[in-house]
Amino acid sequence: MNDKLQEEHNEKDTTSQINGFTPPHMSIDFHSNNNSNIIETIGVSKRLGNSVLSELDSRASSKFEFLKDQSEQQYNGDKNNEPKSGSYNINEFFQAKHDSQFGQMESLDTHYTLLHTPKRKSQHAIPQDRSDSMKRSRPSRSIPYTTPVVNDITRRIRRLKLRNSLVNGNDIVARARSMQANSNINSIKNTPLSKPKPFMHKPNFLMPTTNSLNKINSAHRNTSSSSTASSIPRSKVHRSISIRDLHAKTKPVERTPVAQGTNSQLKNSVSVFDRLYKQTTFSRSTSMNNLSSGTSAKSKEHTNVKTRLVKSKTSGSLSSNLKQSTATGTKSDRPIWR
């Protein structure tokens, strides 16, 4: 019987005939004892496969015997019908059984659908909506306000509220404190972070450099040398003393070496303003008399000669001095006023 079913299936299957290819599941002999090949092709465990296949074989055999008995009874009852091709077509029997059992099944529409489905709005509902809107637009009568009836439940609720307010009176203060603390925290969070002040180094231009020190020292040395060179000792003589006697009496003053440390050393506290704008050299407006007076005051400390200057010199005395110097062949120094 199974061979016949397989042959009929192969005849109906046109894809396998056209392509000349039989799928692997059709070539499997399900009723053969060699179940290991089926398990290897399907890809399941042997223990599970053997148990499942044995159960299917037993069920199929019992079902086939039951159907075979019914088909023989139906064939014997219908004697007028001649058998087709010497055997009863079992496919028709299976189809009839399937149709009868499938017709008795409950349909999915009646089983899964809701009992009360929402209806669609019909055209009759439009004037009803309009009538409702008209009713709403009309001025409604004033409804008298009625105070709700005070029941025992409302009284109990009021008592509980009063009791909680009296017992938990300190909670209000605690809540106020917590709210204030939260506000302080929020204010601290909202304030921008103050950046730390960068470490400020002292500017280098405030400190004297080696070049500036050398320049200032050289300027001090030049001024000291010029002042010592220009300071010529003058002896204060009386009017009656002649210039020759004056030259004979006066002796060259020994120059005392000036301590280099006093002028050369510069204090570290000299600022930029003093170095830039302080006048280290003498201006042009100062005359030679002022310089000579300043240097003569310094030279008086080293000399013990007590002399005084002549108040005024006439042009005659100056010319006589020049004549005497040329006659004797001696050279006279230039006057200080030149």
Curated annotation (Swiss-Prot):
InterPro entries: She1
Family, similarity comment: Belongs to the SHE1 family.
The entry's keywords: Cell cycle, Cell division, Chromosome partition, Cytoplasm, Cytoskeleton, Mitosis, Phosphoprotein
Region of interest: Disordered: 1-29, 67-88, 116-146, 215-263, 284-338
BP GO terms, sorted: cell division; establishment of mitotic spindle localization; mitotic spindle elongation
Gene label: SHE1
Domain of life of the native organism: Eukaryota
Sites bearing Phosphoserine, chain numbering: S165
Organism phylogeny: Eukaryota, Fungi, Dikarya, Ascomycota, Saccharomycotina
Residue ranges of coiled coil: none
Name of the featured protein: Mitotic spindle-associated protein SHE1
Keyword Iron: no
Subcellular location: Cytoplasm, Cytoskeleton; Cytoplasm, Cytoskeleton, Spindle; Bud neck
Main location: cytoplasm
A matching Pfam family: Msap1
Any GO CC annotation of this UniProt entry: nuclear microtubule
Note: Present with 264 molecules/cell in log phase SD medium.
Function: May have a role related to the spindle integrity function of the DAM1 complex, which is essential for proper chromosome segregation. Causes growth arrest when highly overexpressed.
MF annotations from Gene Ontology: microtubule binding
Bias type Basic and acidic residues, positions: 1-14, 242-254
Stretches with biased composition (Low complexity): 216-234
Comp. bias intervals (Polar residues): 72-88, 284-297, 312-330
Organism: Saccharomyces cerevisiae (strain ATCC 204508 / S288c) (Baker's yeast)
Residues making up the signal peptide according to the UniProt record: none
